[in-house]
Structure formats: C-alpha cells, structure tokens
Amino acid sequence: MNGTEGLNFYVPFSNKTGVVRSPFEYPQYYLAEPWQFSVLAAYMFLLIVLGFPINFLTLYVTVQHKKLRTPLNYILLNLAVANLFMVFGGFTTTLYTSLHAYFVFGPTGCNLEGFFATLGGEIALWSLVVLAIERYVVVCKPMSNFRFGENHAIMGLALTWIMAMACAAAPLVGWSRYIPEGMQCSCGIDYYTSRQEVNNESFVIYMFVVHFTIPLVIIFFCYGQLVFTVKEAAAQQQESATTQKAEKEVTRMVIIMVVAFLICWVPYASVAFYIFTHQGSDFGPIFMTIPSFFAKSSSIYNPVIYIMMNKQFRNCMLTTLCCGRNPLGDDEASTTASKTETSQVAPA
C-alpha cells in the first residue's frame, strides 16, 4: 500500500520513513508546503465571503417580495438553504483547519464537516432532478395540462432532503465513514479503504449508483425529451411566442445549472471513483484536494446563475439593495415579459 491507514484516517503517503502522523493531532507539512495550506485557507475564505451574502440575499429578497414565492422558486431557495449549511457547517471548519495544516477538530468535527459537505452536494443534485422533472412535465406535457403547484414543490423539497440524508447520514450511523482527504484539511466519504467493519465498499457502490448515476440519468432523459419537444413546438407554432420564450428562458437557466453542477462535481466523482477502484495505488494529496475544493464552489454558482438569468428576481434584488428603488429604472411590475404558466418565473 502506498498510503498509511490509521484507525480513523488514511494518509496518501507511505510511512516507510516514519514521518506520517495522525491528521487529527499533527500538522501535515510532509504532504505539502506551508504556502499550499495557506492557499487552501485563502480559497475557503473567498468562498465564505462570497457564499454567505449571495445565498442569504437570495433568501432575504424572496421573503421581502411575495411575487417571488412561487412553487418553482421553492426548489431554488432549497439550494440556497443547503449552500448556507455548507458555508457555516463546512467552509468555516475547513478554513480553520487549513490555517493549522491538519484537522484540529478531531474525528467528531470531521464527521460534521463531511456530513454538511455531502448533504449540500446531494441536495443540489436532487434539486436539479426535481427541476428537470418539473421542466419535463410542464413543457413535454406527458400528463396533459399538468400544473406544478405548491404541493408538488413541497413534495419535491421533501424528496431532496430525504435522499440527501439517506446518503449523508449513513456514515454517521456506521455504514462507511468520514475521514480527512487530500491534504487532510477537509473530510469526505472514505473512498480509500475497503474497511470491512463499516461495509465501506457497499456504501460507495450504493452512493455512486443511487446518488450520482441514477439522478444524472433522470436529468439527461428529461432534458433530452425537453429539447426535442421545444424544437417541435417551435416548428409547429403550438404555443404563443411569449409562452415559448418564457419556457425557453426558464429551461435554459436550469440547464446551465446542471452544466455548472457537472463541471464542479464530475471531477471530484471521477477522482473518487478512480481511488476506490485502485485502492493502494500511488497518488499524491493534491490529486484529491483540487477536485474536492473545486466542488465546494458549487455553493456560489447556483444563486449567481439564478440572479443573472431571472429578470424578475434581479429587479427585486436591486430594489431591495437600493432601499425600494431600482437604479436601472426597470420596474418588474411594469414589465411586459410573460411568465410561464406553471413556474411563474419571468424570463431574463
């Protein structure tokens, strides 16, 4: 084995020279230079500085403006809540541990940080599944004139949290475990060892199949059908021009969210899968650290995409920030842009 396994950790560094120490007790400067840990800390600080205000503003603006409290927006707000969990439960912890170059909070802190990071990522993924299904049902109309209402949104929210908890909570109750990964300053699922005592291999397979592959298959199926339907409707002029435009804008926004999710999480999932299928192989701490920390940026992109591509929300945000006045003079109440009949989201 080219790494060193302990009771509750796996360090990707051979202990032939006797330098490996527990990542819960000693700085890990034998894994990377001090400046590299400082870079990680600076990156986490940036995510906190950007992630908290963006996601908090998303929630606050929605509370302030009743017109934004629509069924589809419930799912988008769900992402903001999950991102705030990641910021406070994960990013602040990782910032502190990066400054010390080891996981100073011990195994319990590792469990909490790993839980919040996994929970946030899974809520984001299952929220995108719900959005994809909503777009498919509304635009493709497999169930005639189905209207995505408040009850459907609540059921969608429940699904995202149930599925996310089914994944993130399992290591806390003995199915797999959370351990420090990469440069040992953040925690995640144990992809590195078989760990028979906690049935680690079965959990990793379960996670990749149920909580990654199946959601992506659903998403790609829904959008494949959706693209075909939108093109067909446009060719046959089955919908009014304003309705088609609104549906296309909302669909484009959600598709961009999906693409952004893939960009952030596929590198991490790919590296994790490689490590899992090549346990004991030689790889350095940076190999897992970069995709792991890159995936954490997912807490920022969804609200940014939403703000940039949703004219109604953008105008409400400017009105809130500017004490009741929109400096662009584009009052949402007077805009003639049509909303989709189901999602009630105005096009950008």
Swiss-Prot record:
GO terms, biological process: absorption of visible light; G protein-coupled opsin signaling pathway; visual perception
Modified residues (N6-(retinylidene)lysine): 296
MF terms (GO), sorted A to Z: 11-cis retinal binding; G protein-coupled photoreceptor activity; metal ion binding
Keyword Ribosomal protein carried by entry: no
Chain location of the short sequence motif 'Ionic lock' involved in activated form stabilization per the record: 134-136
GO (cellular component) term, any one: membrane
Pfam families recorded: 7tm_1 (PF00001), Rhodopsin_N (PF10413)
Subcellular location: Membrane; Cell projection, Cilium, Photoreceptor outer segment
Binding site for Zn(2+): 201, 279
InterPro entries: GPCR_opsins, GPCR_Rhodpsn, GPCR_Rhodpsn_7TM, Opsin, Retinal_BS, Rhodopsin, Rhodopsin_N
Ranges of the Extracellular topological domain: 1-36, 100-111, 174-202, 275-286
Transmembrane domains' residue ranges: 37-61, 74-99, 112-133, 153-173, 203-227, 253-274, 287-306
Disulfide pattern: 110-187
Positions of post-translational Phosphoserine modification: 334, 338, 343
Lipidation (S-palmitoyl cysteine): 322-323
Keywords: Acetylation, Cell projection, Chromophore, Disulfide bond, G-protein coupled receptor, Glycoprotein, Lipoprotein, Membrane, Metal-binding, Palmitate, Phosphoprotein, Photoreceptor protein, Receptor, Retinal protein, Sensory transduction, Transducer, Transmembrane, Transmembrane helix, Vision, Zinc
Cytoplasmic topological intervals: 62-73, 134-152, 228-252, 307-348
Role summary: Photoreceptor required for image-forming vision at low light intensity. Light-induced isomerization of 11-cis to all-trans retinal triggers a conformational change that activates signaling via G-proteins. Signaling mediates the activation of phospholipase C. Subsequent receptor phosphorylation mediates displacement of the bound G-protein alpha subunit by arrestin and terminates signaling.
Family: Belongs to the G-protein coupled receptor 1 family. Opsin subfamily.
Binding partners and assembly: Homodimer. May form a complex composed of RHO, GRK1 and RCVRN in a Ca(2+)-dependent manner; RCVRN prevents the interaction between GRK1 and RHO. Interacts with GRK1. Interacts (phosphorylated form) with SAG. Interacts with GNAT1. Interacts with GNAT3. SAG and G-proteins compete for a common binding site. Interacts with PRCD; the interaction promotes PRCD stability. Forms a complex with ASAP1 and ARF4. Forms a complex with ASAP1, RAB11A, Rabin8/RAB3IP, ARF4 and RAB11FIP3; the complex regulates Golgi-to-cilia rhodopsin/RHO transport in photoreceptors.
Name of the protein described by the UniProt record: Rhodopsin
Organism: Tursiops truncatus
